[in-house]
């Protein structure tokens, strides 16, 4: 029950003094009307202000000006800014350089201008766009503590470029995995259809689908979070599920399925990759004559050996191609998953955790996962160069400023590799076993040699294997 003063009115000032300002109100004059102190013009006001201003300042950061509670900022020191700026600049420059090498190599080297490499060029262009149009603005924003300084209009443009380029890179990786799978499982029919027009249609579809994800925020379905300090993609539940599913989860599922199919084909090929032994020679097919072994059915045996070697080379070629495709695609899928999975898991969960108005995730966590995803654009050119000898040779020539005769070098390198494969047996132990058996069973024959022998008296000459009865005689010695 509320207290009243002597005049019958509630003692509001006493309640304010005792409950709202219990510490400051001690020792102040009575604020009630009966106390004679004017609550407005009394001398307590300066004293109250001095007491309040003398209190310790809070240790937490002041809330931002916007009502949404966005705009968390980090104040870096000078050393931290130098270290972070150097790392981000290095990532950006290496991404630009690596993807420029890919584009220049495929466009200007005749041997690399193949339809299958058009997808690699599209991937390099998407990654290059990320490095040129996205990374610099994110770097500046991070160095000043997370505050967006480029305005409201450019925020929407920046988000559209970021989403489109990153999605195009991810979807191109997905299409490359499908291309590799079809090339392995349909080696006779797919290369016929794999022409420039088909590749151009696939690339155009990838970029159009990537652009479609950026359209909803621009046309009013889901507005981006955009004010004086924050530039964040829309946190609408429906748009978040749609964009993350199309940009990441569906392509990742397709890539994992393609890798599993190629890996299964490689395992199946390895299980069937039996190296047939050389035909056994039965005892009744060998005739010992004068200590020299002669082999029957020589023509049939040589034909069998030739067929076995051809079958061997074909099996090994298929097996190596499948193994290389499985290894390459496995590394690509692994790097892609490690780089982008944390970011998209966070992006999917953020609206359900923080709501649709802003982000409550610590800024350093968001930026770490974001730059980890951007790093995928950096490593893609080096992954393909590691597994492609022609790209490695072209990179080396371009970095050494040896621009002339690159096509001739690639042709010579390819011819040298083909000669090495032709001279080197695919399975040395198999060919050695066959050749050794042939040498042991059928030694090389030599023509007869004529010699003059001298004997006295008559005796049996073991070399000629006959009885010599004359003083001189020309004898033909057979092997």
From Swiss-Prot:
SUPFAM superfamilies: Family A G protein-coupled receptor-like. Its main location: membrane. It is found in: Cell membrane. Residues 109-118, 179-198, 261-326, 388-479 are cytoplasmic. It is a multi-pass membrane protein. Changing residue 374 to A: Decreased G-protein coupled receptor activity in response to serotonin. Serotonin binds at residue 162. Changing residue 166 to A: Decreased G-protein coupled receptor activity in response to serotonin. The keyword Transmembrane applies. Keywords: Cell membrane, Disulfide bond, G-protein coupled receptor, Glycoprotein, Lipoprotein, Membrane, Palmitate, Receptor, Transducer, Transmembrane, Transmembrane helix. One of its GO terms (cellular component) is trans-Golgi network membrane. Changing residue 167 to A: Decreased G-protein coupled receptor activity in response to serotonin. GO terms for biological process: adenylate cyclase-activating serotonin receptor signaling pathway; blood circulation; chemical synaptic transmission; circadian rhythm; G protein-coupled receptor signaling pathway, coupled to cyclic nucleotide second messenger; smooth muscle contraction; vasoconstriction. InterPro entries: 5HT_7_rcpt, GPCR_Rhodpsn, GPCR_Rhodpsn_7TM. GO terms for molecular function: G protein-coupled serotonin receptor activity; neurotransmitter receptor activity; serotonin receptor activity. A lipid is attached at residue 401 (S-palmitoyl cysteine). The chain crosses the membrane at residues 84-108, 119-140, 153-178, 199-219, 238-260, 327-352, 364-387. PROSITE patterns: G_PROTEIN_RECEP_F1_1, G_PROTEIN_RECEP_F1_2. Glycans are attached at residues 5, 66. Disulfide bonds join 155-231. G-protein coupled receptor for 5-hydroxytryptamine (serotonin), a biogenic hormone that functions as a neurotransmitter, a hormone and a mitogen. Ligand binding causes a conformation change that triggers signaling via guanine nucleotide-binding proteins (G proteins) and modulates the activity of downstream effectors. HTR7 is coupled to G(s) G alpha proteins and mediates activation of adenylate cyclase activity. Specificity for G(s) G alpha proteins is determined by the length of transmembrane regions 5 and 6 (TM5 and TM6). Belongs to the G-protein coupled receptor 1 family. PANTHER family: ADRENERGIC RECEPTOR-RELATED G-PROTEIN COUPLED RECEPTOR, IP13425P-RELATED. This is 5-hydroxytryptamine receptor 7. It comes from Homo sapiens (Human).
């Amino acid at each position: 029950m509320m207290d009243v003063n002597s005049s019958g009115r509630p003692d509001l000032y006493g309640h304010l003094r005792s409950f709202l300002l219990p510490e400051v109100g001690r020792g102040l004059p009575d604020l009630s009307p009966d106390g004679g102190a004017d609550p407005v013009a009394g001398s307590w006001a300066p004293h109250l202000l001095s007491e309040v201003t003398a209190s310790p300042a809070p240790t937490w950061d002041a809330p931002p000006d916007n009502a949404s509670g966005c705009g968390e900022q980090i104040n870096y020191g000078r050393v931290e800014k130098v270290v972070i700026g150097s790392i981000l600049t290095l990532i950006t420059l290496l991404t630009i350089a690596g993807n420029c090498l890919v584009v220049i190599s495929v466009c200007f080297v005749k041997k690399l201008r193949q339809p299958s490499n058009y997808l690699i060029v599209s991937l390099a262009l998407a990654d290059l766009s990320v490095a040129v149009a996205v990374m610099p603005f994110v770097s500046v924003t991070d160095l000043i503590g997370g505050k967006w300084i480029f305005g409201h209009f450019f925020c929407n443009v920046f988000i559209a470029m970021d989403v489109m380029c990153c999605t195009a890179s991810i979807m191109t990786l997905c299409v490359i995995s499908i291309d590799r799978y079809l090339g392995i499982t349909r080696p006779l029919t797919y290369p016929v259809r794999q022409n420039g027009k088909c590749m151009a249609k696939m690339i155009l579809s990838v970029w159009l689908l990537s652009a479609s994800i950026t359209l909803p925020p621009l046309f009013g379905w889901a507005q981006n979070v955009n004010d004086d300090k924050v530039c964040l993609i829309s946190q609408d539940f429906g748009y978040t599920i749609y964009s993350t599913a199309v940009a990441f989860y569906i392509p990742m599922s397709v890539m994992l399925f393609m890798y599993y199919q190629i890996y299964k084909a490689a395992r199946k090929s390895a299980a069937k990759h039996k190296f047939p032994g050389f035909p056994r020679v039965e005892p009744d097919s060998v005739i010992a004559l004068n200590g020299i072994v002669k082999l029957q059915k020589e023509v049939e045996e040589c034909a069998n050996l030739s067929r076995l070697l051809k079958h061997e080379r074909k099996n090994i070629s298929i097996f190596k191609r499948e193994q290389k495709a499985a290894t390459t695609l496995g590394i690509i899928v692994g790097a892609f998953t490690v780089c982008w999975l944390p970011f998209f898991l966070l992006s999917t969960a953020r609206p359900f955790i923080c709501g649709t108005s802003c982000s409550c995730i610590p800024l350093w966590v968001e930026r770490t996962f974001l730059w980890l995803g951007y790093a995928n654009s950096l490593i893609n050119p080096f992954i393909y160069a590691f597994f492609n000898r022609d790209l490695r040779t072209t990179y080396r020539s371009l970095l050494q400023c040896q621009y002339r005769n690159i096509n001739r070098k690639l042709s010579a390198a390819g011819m040298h590799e083909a000669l090495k494969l032709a001279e080197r047996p695919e399975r040395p132990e198999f060919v050695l076993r066959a050749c050794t058996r042939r040498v042991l069973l059928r030694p090389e024959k030599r023509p007869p040699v004529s010699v003059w022998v001298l004997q006295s008296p008559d005796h049996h000459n073991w070399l000629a294997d006959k009885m010599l009865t004359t003083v001189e005689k020309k004898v033909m010695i057979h092997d």
